[in-house]
């Protein structure tokens, strides 16, 4: 049966068989991921109508180029060194024990175990801290991992892959689980690469594993342990190897100088363990193996057992019974457990010995053993035996798993019916005067499924509002009416997370009550893989909320302690009798301090940050001290490689790592487990990386400055050429404008002459109409005739002969005289008319000159001489157009 771990595609396999736990190395190293930089993101808040809910932060986190879900702490791989390699310092959350109390032993070969990444089954083998994989289906190996084992740096490794590996047949995996990514090549090509880079001997166990002498691939070995089995056996070996040197005083745990909360937790769990019925003789059997997921569900008491229960079981029962018990795991099981599809990682389930051995409970010895020692969830468990009862309860466990899965928000409907239901839910919070019975009646009118409907734009439910505003009565009524505490908002936040973001629960001192109601959602993660601990650490960075965050964390740890003690007392008095009820299954899956410390305390979000890492960056000492007291690991790095130790958490003033000593004080651990050396190496790596980054940045800056200077010089040259062109164009423009002005002046003169000609023609026409058209030749002849006549008269007067006969007739003379008179009169009238017109124009011009010179009209004649000299002194011709425009503007004033 498969169980997908939230947030990643990793699915482990469990095969029955011998774990060879005696050959496992006793050091444990947490899985270190290569993560990108993380920042404290903004936690959006909502504003209920009857409460004050502030925003918890506004800093925006930069997006990652490729977000990958990380496995929880229960699925982190462990690192074991090959014989002869340098021992690696422990990075687990139990570092204070493993570094100080475990005696140094010769390193042994790392085991080969099975795992599933991105739905592909692989054999996994760790060498020098590098997990090397070989596919079970086609025996292909990851060339990237082989080069890592060979110690090839990342830059050279990339060039080798591009030039040597990827030129041939290969398969490049970029998506999916991070450890599975890389370049996969065939077995033969992988063998050549191993020989080329001198790692064939190191990888020989994996290369030759599950292969026949003739080189063919045999069927999958069912005795190969899974990663969880190998890690559980390794941790058991680690404890057993240091059990004799461990000090058992104080609280009876290997956690030294822990807080009162953690000490109470350990006392409660130990009491529940030792109060369970049945004798606890040293030489008698401890308890029958039960089906339990070792890594993620193992309690703290796994580190308190004595000898291996597998060996005790072999001593107390005949070999044939042992063989029968182990062979039962390979038989077809109900519920899909058959030989072709081995059972995968399942939900945790505690059973009595009778249920653990299933069909073999009829054996009298086994039955007596089961009756004498019923199962206890607080005792260590090393068995990986699958029983028919376990398969029969798969459906029940799947239902319980579904209850622990966050429910996505319902769609925000806009219908009238939905608005009415939303208004009914809102009225519960807005109407403070509503009675308790009225609230109950209102909730009864709404279907349980509609209680989870979103009531605001961020898809918060009524349960979110009640938890945020710390309305305990409404919160209880909603749960009783059927509202799901697993329904999340658009950010994947549960009501419990929302309650930890604001200070209302701190002000009302209601967090313990909220945890009693919503505590079963503590393991749920939001869309960024953050737990309640992450939200508490993030909220502590907001001004004025540090005290509330400290209070929430204290209440949370206290609640976990109480849950562990309550579960221990209840389950010790319960037996499954062939099947478990829903309530019993829920009790069995409650979160106790053991699971809290192994699964939640060091859980990493999508950016790789643990709650301690966030608190270390923020610098909240109260949160840091509480997390360190319950053994949060300061050595887990995020995607950017930053650890709490980089911020001085878990490091003394000299830079040496600190651990908890028996005396209750911090002691140096620089010589134990290579912690100080590891810290110094990490610091040197950071300094080297920063130096390289600064050098590279400076070189890039200088190169960019040179390029910019070249561009500036080119622009200056272009600017000079452009300026010259502009000056030439301006000169040409001035010349063109001068020519245009001359043309305009010439056109104006022509226009004036044409107008004057038209006026003269008009006057001539009028004159001809008045006096008649005159012939110039006849007029000249008349003058000549007059002159001749006068000469004749003068001659006659002087005694010349009579010339009367030559004179014109009197009638002609009279006509001529009359014509002369008329002409004279017409000329006189024209003169008078001209004088009148000249007088009018003269008055206008006099008034114009008076306005221009700012004097009276009578004084114009006295200043005329000076004005004439001023006008005559002007050089060049006057612009007639400007004079006409000026006179035209003045005519309106004069008129």
Swiss-Prot record:
Protein name as annotated: Transcription factor SWI6
Originating gene: SWI6
UniProt entry tagged with the keyword Iron-sulfur: no
ANK repeat feature ranges: 458-488, 607-636
Location in the cell: Nucleus
Biased composition range(s): Low complexity: 64-100
The keyword Mitochondrion is assigned to this record: no
Domain spans labelled HTH APSES-type: 112-219
DNA-binding region as annotated in the record: 143-164
UniProt xrefs under SMART domains: ANK, KilA-N
Protein's organism: Pyricularia oryzae (strain 70-15 / ATCC MYA-4617 / FGSC 8958) (Rice blast fungus)
Keyword set, alphabetical order: ANK repeat, Coiled coil, Conidiation, Nucleus, Repeat, Sporulation, Transcription, Transcription regulation, Virulence
Lineage: Eukaryota, Fungi, Dikarya, Ascomycota, Pezizomycotina
